[in-house]
Amino acid sequence: MRTIKPLLTTVSIVAAGLTLAACGGGSTSAGDSSLSGQVGIDGSSTVFPLTALAAEDFQTVNSGVQVKVGSSGTGGGFEKFCRGESDANDASRPIKDDEAAACASAGVAYGPLTVAVDALTIVVSKDNTWATCLTTDQLGAIWAPGSTVANWNEIDPSFPAEPIKLFGPGTDSGTFDYFTGVINGEEGASRTDYTPSEDDNVIVQGVSGSKGGLGYFGFTYYEENADKLTAVQIDSGSGCVAPSAATAQDGTYAPLSRPLFVYPSIAALARPEVAAFFQYYVDNDASIAEGAQYIPLNEAQRTTLKADFAALLAQASTAPSPIAS
């Protein structure tokens, strides 16, 4: 499978128009050489490789539209999006109330599209031979605000007295919000004495370079670095379950399986080049997800995606046509 190197924070990809079917969907086709302009997308580092690959594939059959995909974190991306600085925002969690209010105040209308499923993955170094499975309570004990857990044997007396070195996403990350919400019971509630980064490769390097390292990020980053890291099985009360496409889809990898989103602006979708890109993204969602080593939607979820996009296109068809970026 093809992979996108998530070390990059901005990708500029030349892509262009497809002949867009009437509102409601339809097939895409190449060859509309009159299509031009730019599409700007920012947001989640977790969703970044997926959208970047969609843009890359769009380029192979079209030319003339520049698609720029950035990676400033879900929260940082929503700040830009609600200021009108991007056409869409990648997100690893739903938009928050304060973000929705900011968009509403700025007159930015949008809609969420679920483009893939993720298994938020807890990782340790290859030198860690003891933490093969952790309970959600143990994770909470490690990551809770004010936690003083410093060594592995404080989590389980059978573990060695090895210092725990923690790595994770920064506070602008949707992954941080999701993890803290399901593990600590409140979004943003976390101990602060860890190494944060919006670049998941920094987390990979930190955990893999420390015998007692522990971190978390999206499943695709684990798959790309499985030679350096070990994925920890999670026990939420029904036994140890490893992260995988199957366990994320069937819900057994609870509570760390989650949907991944792209939020396009309704006004941006009124521009032909933006609508064409997202039509391509939706129509080819399964192959894009598989190509980027993500967990694709099941048939029911894919049907919902197409219906959601058709509804957004219908709204865009009545929106004032903005000036192309």
Task: Please identify what each model-predicted range represents.
Residues 1-11:
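Bacterial N-terminal signal peptides that target proteins for export
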Residues 17-22:
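C-terminal motif of bacterial Sec signal peptides marking the signal peptidase cleavage site
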Residues 23-325:
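Flexible loop/hinge segments at secondary-structure junctions
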